[in-house]
């Protein structure tokens, strides 16, 4: 026998399953049917512009029932109610997991959140489809469901597919969040022309978290790129650390899913939450 095949990573396993899911979805609803549904889909807002509006630091709050690393986080959670808690707390973006097997999310969750924030008008948070996207079909699905952006994970895409999905997303009016975890992926993301790059502190191969990842990689990006720090963020100190490293946004999932008052927690992360102990504001 030849050399042993490396064990598939968690990312490999999820992507392989997603490819099967997409093949099934195409049989149930061909791409032409989705294309036809585009006419009635809600108009996306500019994701980068919406994040920059909350300078110096935008919070993207994530709706996540479960994950491969933690198992169930909040399995019975109502995605729409949680999304509205995030919106009321001042989130610039709401990331909705739509992967069904490991994260227990659905496209219906995303459509529901998008419908609910519609009432806020132009100030509404942008809605991100958080998934393992490997096919234009999923980008179409996202747009029809009301997404303003989609996640593209560099580790799961070759350069050609990354470029193709970036272009296709932009044609549909969505600026993607392009996710990286190491220097090689960061260079690939920059070369692809990504405008919003998310540095994931969690390695999707092992699911280990290292908050130093953002510190190390942020300096590789050029000035025009909007950087977001993803994973492992739970305190105002974490946010300040990533802001100092050059990030303009943080994506926060698990700590908000577990918070008693997610809206207040977002205020705390943004530094806009006023508690009785912080009275220095009045001295300005």
What annotation goes with each model-predicted range?
Residues 60-78, 125-134, 175-179, 228-233:
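Active-site mouth loops of central-metabolism enzymes
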Residues 96, 141-161, 198-207, 245-266:
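Glycine-rich phosphate-binding active-site loops on the catalytic face of alpha/beta enzymes
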Residues 5-76:
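An N-cap/entry alpha-helix motif that binds or orients negatively charged groups
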Residues 54, 104-128, 154-155, 161-179, ...:
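Alpha-helix-loop-beta-strand connector modules within alpha/beta enzyme cores
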Residues 14, 61, 86, 94, ...:
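Conserved, mostly hydrophobic/aromatic
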Residues 134-145, 181-192, 229, 233-252, ...:
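Catalytic cores of alpha/beta
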Residues 90-91, 116-119, 144-150, 170-174, ...:
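Glycine-enriched alpha-helix->loop->beta-strand junction motifs that scaffold or abut catalytic
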Residues 32-42, 68-74, 92-113, 201-205:
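Glycine-rich, proline-tolerant flexible connector loops at the mouths of alpha/beta enzymes
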């Amino acid at each position: 026998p030849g050399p042993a095949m490396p064990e598939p990573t968690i990312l490999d396993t999820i992507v392989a399953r997603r490819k099967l899911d997409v093949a099934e979805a195409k049989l149930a609803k061909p791409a032409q049917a989705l294309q036809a549904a585009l006419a009635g889909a809600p108009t996306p807002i500019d994701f980068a512009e919406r994040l920059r509006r909350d300078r110096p630091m935008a919070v993207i709050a994530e709706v996540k029932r479960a994950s491969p690393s933690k198992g169930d986080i909040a399995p019975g959670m109502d995605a729409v109610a949680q999304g509205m808690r995030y919106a009321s707390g001042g989130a610039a973006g709401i990331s909705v997991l739509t992967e069904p097997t490991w994260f227990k999310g659905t496209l219906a969750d995303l459509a529901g959140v998008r419908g609910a924030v519609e009432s806020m008008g132009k100030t509404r948070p942008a809605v991100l489809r958080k998934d393992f996207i490997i096919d234009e079909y999923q980008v179409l699905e996202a747009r029809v469901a009301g997404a303003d952006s989609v996640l593209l994970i560099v580790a799961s895409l070759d350069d050609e597919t990354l470029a193709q999905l970036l272009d296709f997303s932009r044609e549909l009016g969505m600026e993607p969040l392009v996710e990286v975890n190491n220097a090689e992926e960061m260079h690939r993301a920059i070369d692809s022309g990504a405008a919003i790059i998310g540095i994931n502190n969690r390695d999707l191969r092992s699911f280990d978290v290292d908050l130093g990842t953002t510190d190390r990689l942020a300096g590789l990006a050029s000035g025009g790129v909007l950087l977001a720090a993803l994973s492992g963020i739970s305190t105002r100190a974490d946010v300040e650390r990533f802001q100092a490293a050059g990030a303009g946004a943080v994506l926060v999932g698990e700590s908000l899913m577990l918070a008693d008052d997610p809206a207040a927690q977002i205020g705390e992360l943004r530094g806009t939450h006023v508690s009785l102990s912080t009275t220095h504001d009045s001295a300005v």
